[in-house]
Amino acid sequence: MRTWVEIDKENLKYNILKLKELADNREVLGVVKANAYGLGSVEIAKILQEVGVNFFGLANLEEAIELQEAGINANFLILGASFEDELVEATKRGIHTAISSMQQLKFLVENNLNPNIHLKFDTGMTRLGFEVDEAEEVINFCKTNNLNLVGIFTHLSDSDGNTIDTKNFTLEQIEKFKNIVKGLDLKYIHISNSAGIT
């Protein structure tokens, strides 16, 4: 027995337009990491561009380069951790990069690199990201060193849960994130995933 998935292009476009509507027509970051979860990142990115998605989230530099080389003309954000050589290459290619440690920030400063950076904060996923209580220090470091801080984000770890505990945890994450970004004027402040919109 074989298993396969068929994607209806028109349904996908309709779903994206509905998500945009639910999100007050804010810009959508189309996450197409891991080959668009096995569906084909180039193909899915092209479909998403047909409905105005021009910013794509990827796991690593290699995935972003694949889309660039396939002729996808858009912004790209590496959501995962980047090694130092990847930070250099991302800067050369104009790829936005998630930054989740002071070590990465110091490397950028020491090597006179200034890519578009998005600070990732850990509000409960417990994987990558700055701790919430580091926010002021990290943001001040970026400002003091004239780093090109264009975004701040976190990940809702349990937004698809349907228990009182998971809903409360998601609300706690949102409150932590609101405290981090309060008073900041950045182009990209992103927290939500598909489940988090509803």
Q: What kind of feature is each model-predicted range?
A:
Residues 56-59, 77-83, 100, 115-123, ...:
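Non-cysteine beta-strand/loop elements that form the S-adenosyl-L-methionine
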Residues 12, 33, 67, 101, ...:
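Conserved, mostly hydrophobic/aromatic
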Residues 64-65, 84-87, 105-106, 135, ...:
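Short, well-ordered alpha-helical microsegments
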Residues 99-102, 176:
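A polyampholytic, Gly/Pro-enriched intrinsically disordered region
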Residues 1-96:
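A charged N-terminal "starter" segment
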Residues 100, 107-108:
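Membrane-helix boundary/helix-loop-helix interface segments in multi-pass membrane proteins
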Residues 37-39, 46, 91, 110-115, ...:
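Active-site loop/helix belt of alpha/beta enzymes
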Residues 6, 118, 129:
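Short aromatic/basic micro-patch
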